[in-house]
């Protein structure tokens, strides 16, 4: 089981170079958790780039049985705030996690799972990265 960040979902949706590696990681994991906040952030980005029709495709993707949408509970809320204090945008830390990032981080942290992501921001935190992810 793994957690997916917005950046990983977008790489799959927009057929970015990491797409095949991310799809393989999702298939290996059998179950991929996604914060409901991550879903909102993903929809916002997709809508801004490609419009509402593309958002419908994202929703279809996330309805596949390999994905589980998880709303933040009290533990995730506390972990997201702690991540903001430690790694959040505007705090001078090189990770500079944004609001959406905080909830993917929190879900992975609370569940003790690795995070599937693209880019260097999470590499500057204490969260484990999915093995084999680019």
Regions found by a protein language model. Give the residues of each.
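Active-site neighborhoods of divalent-metal-dependent phosphate/nucleic-acid chemistry enzymes
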Residues: 68-114
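Short, well-structured N-terminal submotif of metal-dependent ribonuclease cores
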Residues: 1-34, 47-60, 124, 133
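Acidic, PIN/NYN-like endoribonuclease modules and their adjacent C-terminal/linker elements
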Residues: 105-134
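A general structural signal for well-ordered alpha-helical segments in protein cores
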Residues: 19, 39, 55, 77-81
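Glycine/charged-rich beta-loop-alpha catalytic/anionic-binding loops adjacent to active sites
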Residues: 24, 60-62, 85-91
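Short secondary-structure boundary segments
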Residues: 36-37, 73, 119-120
């Amino acid at each position: 089981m793994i957690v997916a960040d917005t950046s990983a979902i977008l790489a799959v949706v927009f057929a970015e170079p990491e797409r095949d590696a991310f799809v393989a990681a999702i298939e290996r994991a059998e179950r991929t958790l996604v914060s409901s906040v991550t879903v909102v952030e993903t929809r916002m980005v997709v809508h801004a780039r490609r419009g509402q029709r593309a958002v419908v495709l994202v929703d279809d993707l996330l309805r596949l049985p390999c994905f589980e949408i998880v709303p933040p509970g009290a533990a995730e809320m506390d972990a997201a705030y702690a991540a903001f204090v430690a790694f959040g945008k505007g705090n001078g830390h090189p990770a500079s996690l944004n609001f959406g990032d905080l909830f993917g981080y929190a879900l992975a942290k609370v569940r003790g799972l690795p995070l599937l992501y693209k880019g260097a921001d999470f590499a500057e935190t204490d969260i484990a990265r999915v093995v084999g992810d680019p």
